[in-house]
Amino acid sequence: MAKKTGLKIDGAAELGKLLQSLPEKLRKKAAREATRRAAELVFKQAKANIRRADGAYRVTLKGGETITRQPGELADAMIMTHVPEAKSYLSQHKVTFARKKHNDVWKIAHFIESGVNVHRITSKNGQEYTHPGHRAYPFLKPAVSKNKAQIYRLIKDGIGDGMKDVLKKKK
């Protein structure tokens, strides 16, 4: 399965205490704005990092059906979404892949991100095939690791701006 990539923020405990002291509506608005901004940055960078094929290519699916994939299908299937009622988080956004679009291309995203070892595949009729594997072509991890400082700043600014917006509406 795909691995989750998260960030640890210095001072997060203090920030959490400060946010807990605020009214719930203000707290949720500020947290949602902060996570949206950070996820948007990661989303755009990851989409730009995704490896694209040079041309159309054929793929045989598990049931034996052969389909043709187009370059950029994985990038087109990438979405950013808010996770409502995220447990143990004030707010959570995630970068993931649309499930229904693009011939289930979402199923291969984690293989591209982390690579595949050489392995044997046995078909239903008993024939064996050695899959050569492939190296990793990470797109999500670099989007997070290269932009950590900017992500921290976006979270900080997002919380501040979210609080300002709610306070303006109260006046």
Feature-to-residue mapping (PLM):
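Short, compositionally biased, intrinsically disordered N-terminal export/targeting signals
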Residues: 2-8
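Short helix/strand-capping connector loops at secondary-structure junctions
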Residues: 128-147
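C-terminal or internal capping secondary-structure element at the end of a domain, subdomain, or sheet
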Residues: 143-171
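A general, composition-driven signal for non-globular sequence regions
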Residues: 21, 26, 140-142, 152
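Short, low-complexity, charged/polar segments at coil/turn and helix-coil boundaries
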Residues: 5, 17-20, 24-131, 161, ...
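Small-xxx-small helix-packing motif
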Residues: 11-12
